[in-house]
Amino acid sequence: MHQGSRTCQISSEGAVLDACYTLAGDKVATCSSTGAIQVWSCETSEASWDLLHVEELPDQPTLLAWCHPEHGQVLAVGTSSGTVHILQGPPPSSSSTSSSSENGNSSSQQQHSREGWGLTGKLPRGQGAVIALAFAPRQQGLVLAVGYSSSPAAAARLGSSLGSSSSVLLFEAAGVVRQQLQWTLLGKIQLPVEADSCSSLCWREAAAGLPPLLAVGHSRGGGIWAYQQPSMRWKELCSLPIPAAAQQQQQQQQQQQLQAMHWAPALSRPRELLAASFGSTVALYSLTPAAPQNNTVSNNTLQQPGQQQLAGLQVELVTVMEHPAPVWKLEFNMIGNTLACSLDGMPEVWFWMPVGMQRLEGLAEWSVVSKIKGNPEAKAQAADDHMLD
């Protein structure tokens, strides 16, 4: 793990709207209010970032998402117009890398990494602005889930082709034609009528015997959906109850939609854990498979050999974690016993861990074990200098 902090200069006239790191953390992509997409690289031991590529888009980019590196350097860019652009980099060059290492000079490798970047595809426009992007686990192929906001004007323009209310569309890269990724509509998740927009998406890691599972957050809560192979449709398995504290925030601040979610790694636990943030409240849910209608006994784990369908999920609100500011992003560590929550408007990250006898299952009370606090003055400086930490 890298120590210290790394700072790269963002040479953009507008504000940085989103930043997304690759799985290895050696590249970061940013999008600005001017419509520019920048890809930065830090592949050496030195804490210096190099600008690999700049792409100007005709519409306003708002969200970024990298796919798993097994599928290459593929970056999805969501826009306020509902279009998703696909930016792709060159494949890794083992020959240039080895020759650079032998000669002790990485100039050819850096030159190769800067070449070959460009737009290689575009997904059909949705009914509203792109609100959420999430690539599926690598075992499920190059599949991208896109969440949209509901837009009456856009829905009238598109008719019933992509739905008339808020929805999540799933696309798959079926192949390459003339150096362009060809994307096909794989499926659609229709959100409740009262949901104004999709707010967040989170895939469960792939596992043998389990159908694809996708957690969807929206303006009226959230739910978990599973792909049913016989009907080739997505089915909602359960809805996520909104904590009482979050409901009070909704009444006081008019609305606190589900902002972020993250699925804890299973690691043979008897139950699943899913964290979701509603404003400053983070809810931790326990998930177990519901018993089939013809059987009153259900297995207490999702991962059952040979199982391809789930009748439903039983949801239990385990605990809530309160913060002094809204939580805009959260993530479990690789073993699922630590939850990091990043605060919005405050340069702080809170780390929570379970305590008590049931801490191995995650059902105990969770408490703050550490905090990372940034420099409050850096926020004002970043706004002036367009810096990204």
Residue ranges and their predicted role:
Residues 20-25, 65-72, 134-141, 202-211, ...:
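Loop/turn segments within WD40 beta-propeller blades
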Residues 31, 78, 147, 216-217, ...:
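Residue-level marker for isolated small/hydroxyl-bearing positions within beta-strands
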Residues 28-55:
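Beta-propeller domains
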Residues 9-35:
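Beta-strand-rich domains and repeat architectures in extracellular enzymes and scaffolds
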Residues 17, 34-38, 81-85, 150-154, ...:
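Short coil/turn segments within WD40 beta-propeller repeats
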Residues 2-12, 46-63, 92-95, 102-132, ...:
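Inter-blade linker and blade-boundary elements of WD-repeat/beta-propeller domains
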Residues 256-292:
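Loop/turn-rich, solvent-exposed surfaces of beta-rich toroidal or solenoidal domains
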